Amino acid sequence: MERIIQQTDYDALSCKLAAISVGYLPSSGLQRLSVDLSKKYTEWHRSYLITLKKFSRRAFGKVDKAMRSSFPVMNYGTYLRTVGIDAAILEFLVANEKVQVVNLGCGSDLRMLPLLQMFPHLAYVDIDYNESVELKNSILRESEILRISLGLSKEDTAKSPFLIDQGRYKLAACDLNDITETTRLLDVCTKREIPTIVISECLLCYMHNNESQLLINTIMSKFSHGLWISYDPIGGSQPNDRFGAIMQSNLKESRNLEMPTLMTYNSKEKYASRWSAAPNVIVNDMWEIFNAQIPESERKRLRSLQFLDELEELKVMQTHYILMKAQW
């Protein structure tokens, strides 16, 4: 199952690279990137892909092929997912001088690179299955631009449970379904009193209900002040809504993969109810975010990149993905 779920990270990586190659990302305004960081953002992601080829030609081939065949509607989705999460992170970082980020199920995500350069008091922890972080560790150390940006040595010198333990950045292996292992790891790499951002980006949808709820409850009780940012698909709650059923069928047929809670938390309200212990919970679908949070000047920029004639398809897709922010 770990290996199957890791394949979904390659999907996310190919989508991110496709959006970058066409110019959807980076969004220097919404991601608050300087000219220099915008240039580095592109270089970091391209270097990650090139270096991936050294360790897995098969994975590189899949990512490269998918990247080149991405449609505008997919690029819009990746753009919204990325800037939506980044905007939530940035809002919390600006409001709190010292912050730690815990990225659950980090995969190949490189969000830590610009954030660590932008915020000198930020600490960042990436956590995922062993196989995923082993590959990420190898790529980060092998690529010169990635290695230098994180201040790493080419040799792996970190001590268990970390693969990377370098200043303000840590990379660690953990099965997040095992709450004992997860708690033990957080005990050694985070501090309770520091304001904490928890990111779960397409993670909880692959976990069973009991395990995911225990993870949420345990982590929220562990930190005195925090912001949980979660991005996931929802199955849809309208009588004639077939989105969730079709998604489940496609995943089962193509990957033998399940999303156990896709239909359990099939609406924004049901999804957000998992964070009922938090006093401040905001949940939006990505279509709402597109219409309410993306300024017209930015939408004009997006329209100049590619012609999008599947506006109704974009609406259907993005109303079935949500961004939830729970603050306590």
From Swiss-Prot:
Transmembrane segments: none annotated. GO terms for molecular function: protein C-terminal leucine carboxyl O-methyltransferase activity. Its EC number is 2.1.1.233. The keyword Zinc does not apply. S-adenosyl-L-methionine binds at residues 81, 105, 128, 175-177, 201. It comes from the Eukaryota. Inhibited by S-adenosyl-L-homocysteine. The keyword Ribosomal protein does not apply. One of its GO terms (biological process) is regulation of autophagy. Keywords: Methyltransferase, S-adenosyl-L-methionine, Transferase. It catalyses: [phosphatase 2A protein]-C-terminal L-leucine + S-adenosyl-L-methionine = [phosphatase 2A protein]-C-terminal L-leucine methyl ester + S-adenosyl-L-homocysteine. InterPro entries: LCMT1, Ppm1/Ppm2/Tcmp, SAM-dependent_MTases_sf. Belongs to the methyltransferase superfamily. LCMT family. Methylates the carboxyl group of the C-terminal leucine residue of protein phosphatase 2A catalytic subunits to form alpha-leucine ester residues. Acts on the two major protein phosphatase 2A catalytic subunits, PPH21 and PPH22. This is Leucine carboxyl methyltransferase 1. It comes from Saccharomyces cerevisiae (strain ATCC 204508 / S288c).
